[in-house]
Structures are given as C-alpha cells and as structure tokens.
Swiss-Prot record:
Amino acid composition bias (Pro residues), ranges on this chain: 28-51
Modified residues (Phosphoserine): 62, 165, 187, 189, 254, 258, 271, 362
Pfam families in the cross-refs: TSC22 (PF01166)
Domain of life the protein comes from: Eukaryota
Name of this chain's protein: TSC22 domain family protein 4
The UniProt record lists the keyword Electron transport: no
Native organism: Rattus norvegicus (Rat)
Location within or outside the cell: Nucleus; Cytoplasm; Cell projection, Dendrite; Synapse
Alphabetized PROSITE patterns for the sequence: TSC22
Recorded name of the encoding gene: Tsc22d4
Assigned GO CC terms: cytoplasm; dendrite; nucleus; synapse
Amino acid sequence: MSGGKKKSSFQITSVTTDYEGPGSPGASDPPAPPAPAGPPPRLPNGEPNPDPGGRGTPRNGSPPPGAPASRFRVVKLPQGLGEPYRRGRWTCVDVYERDLEPPSFGRLLEGIRGASGGTGGRSLDSRLELASLGISTPIPQPGLSQGPTSWLRPPPTSPGPQARSFTGGLGQLAGPGKAKVETPPLSASPPQQRPPGPGTGDSAQTLPSLRVEVESGGLAAGTPPLSRRRDGAVRLRMELVAPEETGKVPPIDSRPNSPALYFDASLVHKSPDPFGAAAAQSLSLARSMLAISGHLDSDDDSGSGSLVGIDNKIEQAMDLVKSHLMFAVREEVEVLKEQIRDLAERNAALEQENGLLRALASPEQLAQLPSSGLPRLGPSAPNGPSI
C-alpha cells in the first residue's frame, strides 16, 4: 500500500497482523515494504484502517502478545528536518533521533537554562529551538521504536499557560525561611505524554517560574517540565498552603503577579533606614512597577528578548529608587543647612557680646578671670572692634 508516503505523519504506526516484511525495529529505509493490496481488515486494537493523513491511527494501540518486533516500521516524512507544519490547530516540528551522548545533551540543556537566567517556563520553546537546530533527545520513548517523533507547540494566537516567561510567572513567595524548591531536570518525553494525576490541575498551570530561596540563598529555576510536573506541583502546593495555614504570609506576597526579582519586605523593615520611610516606599514603588509590567513578557517567544526586557525594568527600578533617595537626601540637607544657619547667627551674636564686654571691662576685671577662660577669650579679642 502507499503507507510509505504518508502526509503529515508524525508518529510511528503499527502494521496489520498479516504483514510479512523482513524489516527490523530501527530500519533506516524510509519506504515501507510491500503489504497486501486491499485495505487491512483490522488493527491490533480492532479499530478500522487509518486514513492517509494518519489521524485515525490509534495512539494507544499495542500489538498482541507474542507479536514479533518487525511489526513496527519507520514512516518517511515529506517535510524536512526542523520544518514546522500545521496539523489542525497545532504547529508541529518533526525530529529524527540520533546517537547523542546523554552527558553532552545534559550540558547543552544546562547551558541553555543558565544563559536564559534560570527560565523554566520556556522549556517547551527551548525544545522546539533544539528541534529546529536538528538536535533531539537520546532517550527513546517507551513502547515506540527509534524513529521520527514530533513535539507540539500551540499556535501563537492562543498560547497555553504552560509556556510562560519567567518575568510574569512568579505567583507567591512562601515566606522567609520556607521557600525551598528543587527543580527536576528536563524530561525527554513529548508534552502529550504527561501522566494525569491530582497534582496536574489548575494549580500546576499557575506554578511560579522563579522562586527566591531564603535558606539556601539562591534562585530556583522554576517551573517543572510538563511530563514531570506532578511531583513539582505537589511540592509547590505544600509550600504555598503551609504558610497560609500558620498565618505567616506577609501581606506584600498576596499579589497574583509579582516580579521575577523580588525583594523580601521583611528585610526592608528590619534594615535601619537613615532617611525614614522614603527608602522603603521607593522599594515598594519599584516592586509595584515591576509587578505591573511583569506580565507583558508572558507571551514573548524569545528568551533573549525577555532578558533584555528584564534588564530594562531593573534599570528603571534602580533609577526610581535613586530618585527617591536623592529626594530624601535633599530634604535632610535642607534641614541641616537651616540648623547651620541658626548656629552661625547665634555664634555671631555671642562674638559681638564678647567683644563689647571686653571693650567695657577694666584690666583688673580681666585679671580676675580664671586662667582656663583666657585661651577662649584671647582669640576673640581682636575681633571685638571689627564687630
């Protein structure tokens, strides 16, 4: 049959039971061996023959017990490697798996994560960028032979909540001393094979993508991958619920969208402020400005663009803090200038009185003054007539 030239096929399909091809599980020939002329009457799970587009192919179809491994074949794809194409409302990219060392692939992923500043919400786009470069994961999928796979990306018109940039994805801080998050490594399985569970509900889609670790003093690179979000969701839910039960959540942490770089309010209140509440107010204004503009980068597709936006916001926040501190310093300087002016006027009046007293006093009266007062009165004597 003409199954070797399927259109927009992105999954390994199974052949009927009467297939007698001599191929092996990892056969490199793209065209399929000849099969019976008529349409196959059945599939391993009893469903009808799939259409040429591959939409009727059962995803969960498994061969009967005792079936040989040659029942699987490699489907040749008409698209080139890394070329995106539309499949319904999804944009798909097909990737061939190659022999790539797992340590080097892990180092590459760590390098990408480090270069993007610990972004975890863009894991899906990072995989797609790797797919466009022709790099695929070395870990085979369970139940499928080594062949072409595809990773799906939602269309740009309706971005899913899973692919959030780390600038606006921070939900709540769990309070000082309790924010410990362990980021699981990137998974090699596609997003559609995420195991369902109670921990993958709405709370898993609104996980914070960047957390501040108070105990360890570091930044945790945020959202777990889609296929292993179950454990991460349970951890984060426990950490977000425990402070609310004990009533120790700071009031500043109840915002739905907080900036990625977050200053703890307790540190601001505990630190000595020489200028009163001006510095704390400036920090709160900077945090609110970042919180308002943090969600603007949630649909940004480029990690570098989001990093540039974050740098610009940090610079704006620092300028705002600097301006508020300058206002406080100017007020203090004005107060000190007034005090210096008053002291100078009082000093001038005292010097004038001293000069008059010295001019009117007799030598006998000056001789009766204590010896300790002479050094103080000596320098001011020549200034008496001038005043």
